[in-house]
From Swiss-Prot:
<dbReference type="GO" id="GO:0019264">
    <property type="term" value="P:glycine biosynthetic process from serine"/>
</dbReference>
<dbReference type="InterPro" id="IPR015421">
    <property type="entry name" value="PyrdxlP-dep_Trfase_major"/>
</dbReference>
<comment type="similarity">
    <text>Belongs to the SHMT family.</text>
</comment>
<comment type="subunit">
    <text>Homodimer.</text>
</comment>
<dbReference type="InterPro" id="IPR049943">
    <property type="entry name" value="Ser_HO-MeTrfase-like"/>
</dbReference>
<dbReference type="InterPro" id="IPR015422">
    <property type="entry name" value="PyrdxlP-dep_Trfase_small"/>
</dbReference>
<feature type="binding site">
    <location>
        <position position="120"/>
    </location>
    <ligand>
        <name>(6S)-5,6,7,8-tetrahydrofolate</name>
    </ligand>
</feature>
<dbReference type="GO" id="GO:0035999">
    <property type="term" value="P:tetrahydrofolate interconversion"/>
</dbReference>
<dbReference type="InterPro" id="IPR019798">
    <property type="entry name" value="Ser_HO-MeTrfase_PLP_BS"/>
</dbReference>
<dbReference type="Pfam" id="PF00464">
    <property type="entry name" value="SHMT"/>
</dbReference>
<dbReference type="GO" id="GO:0005829">
    <property type="term" value="C:cytosol"/>
</dbReference>
<keyword id="KW-0808">Transferase</keyword>
<dbReference type="GO" id="GO:0004372">
    <property type="term" value="F:glycine hydroxymethyltransferase activity"/>
</dbReference>
<feature type="modified residue" description="N6-(pyridoxal phosphate)lysine">
    <location>
        <position position="229"/>
    </location>
</feature>
<keyword id="KW-0028">Amino-acid biosynthesis</keyword>
<feature type="site" description="Plays an important role in substrate specificity">
    <location>
        <position position="228"/>
    </location>
</feature>
<comment type="pathway">
    <text>Amino-acid biosynthesis; glycine biosynthesis; glycine from L-serine: step 1/1.</text>
</comment>
Length: 417
């Protein structure tokens, strides 16, 4: 017999922890650049009965019966994704961005082939060739980095390395890079050396959808992304590609990497894509960028140095070396003050990855709450006060009180706290 108790009765420990996490999100300033807050509609889809359905295969071609409804759900997600990004084909089944990237690699290259990708030490991602990740273990990785003069991607170096190593794949994308990615220039280099270009736009997908960052779709063989971050959907992945790669990519996801898709998550993706197709989503993305620029200027006014001097997108990297702080110390101090960031390697970082010399800061989540330029100026000042006295518990307590007061003016998930 099916248990009929609600969560609070069936498992009070988990129910209590969920309430605590919801309260933490509601009462603190979320500045992790890869995090965002989904809408109640997305949450509703995630918690739906679609979680019960197994649906190996693709719409119209399933290995299980009873898929007539989830076929419609998944097709809606596919159609909305294609419309949102102007793509020939979309696969919405990847459980995460890592699986999307794995499928892209396997569709275009063989183990041992050369991949030219941005170094994790300069803002890339684990799946772009880190030796501890499958990508670094299966492929020969040639990393590219930044110019020391302005801390932006050294396109001359990318071209030189491409000509020297003739990679099978040129991977473009980053997890901690605050400047515009010029996909047309990367495509020129890829075409010159006969490489297939793959773009991981996980961080900037929302900006791309809103036309606030150049789109990689016209220039790339394959584009991968997560569906959260700036896109403000559920945690998950997606692949966009040219029609010529559709069959191969689909087979790499299923049966190559994954089994049954998570149809409740796919439904939530469809809801988020529908939200992103509305005019107000473009206005939201504009506010993300505007808020990031105001926050960046405020942090500089507080005496902090930003990598590359600022931002073109939703995030910025703060170099803490002039403050004689590590990212670990800054993350912990800000956390005690109710401000959540993540420690992050900066270019040419002398510290270890679990210590770092920087923090990464982003504006998507605070923008979702409705905060604007005025609040960004205040947030920058609060961060500055904490980093000026990271060991002073009185300062941290005062800032935490101000953070809680600020958040109270921008309530979130009020019915769930």
């Amino acid at each position: 017999m099916m248990p009929t108790q609600r969560l609070a009765e069936a498992d009070p420990q988990i129910a209590k922890l969920i309430r605590e996490e919801t309260r933490r999100q509601a009462e603190g300033l979320e500045l992790i650049a890869s995090e965002n807050f989904v809408s109640p509609a997305v949450l509703e889809a995630l918690g739906s009965t679609l979680t019960n359905k197994y649906a190996e295969g693709y719409p119209g071609k399933r290995y299980y019966g009873g898929c007539e409804v989830v076929d419609q759900v998944e097709q809606l997600a596919i159609d909305r994704a294609k419309q949102l990004f102007g793509a020939d084909h979309a696969n919405v089944q990847p459980h995460a961005g890592s699986q999307a990237n794995m499928a892209a690699y396997f569709a275009l290259a063989k183990p041992g082939d050369t991949v030219l990708a941005m170094s994790l030490n300069f803002g890339g991602h684990l799946t772009h060739g880190s030796p501890v990740n499958f990508s670094g273990k299966l492929f020969k990785i040639v990393p590219y980095g930044l110019r020391q003069s302005d801390e932006t991607i050294d396109m001359d170096e990318v071209a030189r390395l491409a000509r020297e190593h003739r990679p099978r794949i040129l991977m473009v994308g980053a997890s901690a890079y605050s400047r515009t990615l010029h996909f047309d220039r990367f495509a020129e280099i890829a075409n010159e050396v006969g490489a297939a270009m793959v773009v991981d736009m996980a961080h900037i997908a929302g900006l791309v959808a809103a036309g606030l960052h150049p789109s990689p779709v016209p220039h790339s063989e394959i584009v991968t992304t997560t569906t959260h971050k700036t896109l403000r959907g559920p945690r998950g992945g997606m692949i966009l590609c040219r029609e010529a790669h559709a069959k191969t990519l689909n087979s790499q996801i299923f049966p190559g990497i994954q089994g049954g898709p998570l149809e409740h998550v796919i439904a939530a993706k469809a809801v988020a894509f529908g939200e992103a197709l509305r005019p107000e989503f473009k206005a939201y993305q504009r506010r993300i960028v505007e808020n990031a620029q105001v926050l960046a200027e405020g942090l500089k006014s507080a005496g902090l140095r930003l990598v590359s001097g600022g931002t073109d997108n939703h995030l910025m990297l703060v170099d803490l070396r002039p403050k004689k702080l590590t990212g670990k110390i800054a993350e912990e101090a800000l956390g005690r003050a109710g401000i959540t960031v993540n420690k992050n390697m900066i270019p040419w970082d002398p510290e270890k990855p679990m210590t770092t010399s920087g923090i990464r800061v982003g504006t998507p989540a605070l923008t979702t709450r409705g905060m604007g330029s005025r609040e960004m100026t205040l947030v920058a000042a609060l961060i500055g006060r904490v980093l000026d006295a990271p060991a002073d518990e009185q300062v941290l307590a005062r800032v935490r009180g101000e953070v809680k007061d600020l958040c109270a003016h921008f309530p979130m998930y009020a019915d769930r706290v």
